[in-house]
Amino acid sequence: MAWKLDNDRPIYSEIVEKIKLRIISGFYQPGSKLPSVRDLALEAGVNPNTMQKAFAELENSGLLITMRTSGRMVTEDEERISMVRETIAQEKIDAFLQDMRAVSYTHLRAHETRH
């Protein structure tokens, strides 16, 4: 999965979002071990400290768990993952609807366009 970073907000925030998407899409399965901070930083083309900051935020959100001797793993709490999936989906729907309203595109017009 490519790491396209937009630079329109803090890099670590973009990394958090991309890793969340990898988790909710199943790219990283519940209970699976993540690559090391260094490996992911190299893959993403960012400083390891930036990746570490993103991992810390993901740990605070409950999506990642640190295992002292075996690195970081995706939580096995599928309810937590599902909740994050629903939150992200709702945010994307809200942003889309806001964009459509900004260009005066109504629900009726959208429905008519589809048929």
Residue ranges and their predicted role:
Residues 1-8:
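N-terminal intrinsically disordered/low-complexity leader segments
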Residues 33-44:
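A short alpha-helical element within helix-turn-helix/winged-helix DNA-binding domains
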Residues 78-103:
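Conserved segment of winged-helix/HTH DNA-binding domains
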